[in-house]
Amino acid sequence: EHRVSELCYAMKFSNPENSEEYFTVESLVEAMVLLAAHGPQLPKPERIPRFNDSVEARLNATNDALQPNAGGQIEYWSDAIEGEIRDDPGISLHNPDTDVFMNYTLAGAYDSNIALLLTVGDSRESTYSAMADVLRATSMRGRDLHTNLEFHYGLVNWFLGNNINARPTTK
């Protein structure tokens, strides 16, 4: 997922004639726009480490079988906690005048994704521990609303209880 890559690395573009002149890009979308606009004139970037580790949980509108479940309405979503990076299309915004959560109807006709919940850390274990905290603190309620939040919470804690550095195998 590109958001995880963006949290782990930035790109530094330096003037080949003067290394004191540079700019840093943290968004892959921004880098693609720069490449489209400037093509071969753009110098090769240097990869700059940002955080040692990052993990993402894709919060989706799904039923218990993890199948898409469109059309629900979000009536409450807890605020992000410290260390949580939340990417959503404005769903978690409060009314600027009343500071009340604004109900949000999930279209879901083409994508069941509600938001990305991300954490960063110095190690894989600290990053997953932070994600466990985020998932434990996250509460979302509404009408005909089903999500994979509990699935993610169970999966992250299973990883923490077993080998967090497990490698895939076909054996």
For every predicted segment, state its role.
Residues 1-171:
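ATP-dependent carboxylate activation and anion-phosphoryl transfer catalytic cores
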